[in-house]
Regions:
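Hydrophobic small-molecule pocket/channel-lining residues, especially in calycin-type beta-barrels
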Residues: 19-177
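Bacterial N-terminal signal peptides
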Residues: 5-15
């Protein structure tokens, strides 16, 4: 159940493809601009979890990172072991100019996930953790289809080839004030 709590805001806020390496001297965030803004999210997951919330992607720290902040709404339902007050942050950054983007996820339960970031197409962002680390491998996918952002937080256990969705979500972009 703690893993569900780990994943909920990750999906509320908030895949394997070739790494997108931005040419040196270009805007590293150009391929991810479709993520920017505040998005509504209705998430469903294993063990009967249903949650509503929002997440915002925006550049911060002088345009050096792309940050995702999430909030849970009042409509969270799940088993007693599920943390409806979960909080997390996702930071996307370019470690070395001209190299693929990286991301790091933190939450209030002490989980940390490091991701490689790629953009298989103009409306898809794929966050993939290192499969050589102990434990499950994680995949976070954002896809913009029309005016709806959808996504999945998935896990693959060591020795397995199939990804299992832990949470899935979708929602529209909120109008800017």
């Amino acid at each position: 159940m703690k893993m569900m709590a780990l994943a909920l805001p990750l999906l509320l806020t908030l895949p394997v493809a070739a790494q997108s390496v931005p040419p040196s001297g270009t805007d590293p965030w150009k391929a991810l601009t479709f993520l920017e803004g505040t998005w509504e999210a209705k998430a469903t997951g294993s063990a009967g979890v249903v949650a509503m919330g929002t997440y915002t992607f925006r550049t911060e720290l002088g345009n050096h990172i792309l940050a995702r902040h999430s909030t849970n709404g009042a409509g969270c339902k799940g088993p007693a072991t599920f943390d409806c007050d979960h909080g997390d942050l996702l930071y996307v950054f370019q470690d070395v100019p001209g190299q693929p983007l990286k991301a790091v996820y933190f939450d209030n339960e002490g989980h940390v996930i490091h991701y490689d970031v790629s953009t298989p197409d103009a409306t898809t962002a794929l966050f993939l953790s290192d499969s050589s680390q102990p434990g499950p491998q994680f995949r976070l996918l954002y896809e913009l289809k029309g005016a709806t952002m959808s996504g999945k937080f998935q896990m693959r256990m060591p020795g397995q080839s199939d990804w299992k969705s832990y949470l899935e979500w979708s929602g529209a972009k909120r109008p800017q004030n």
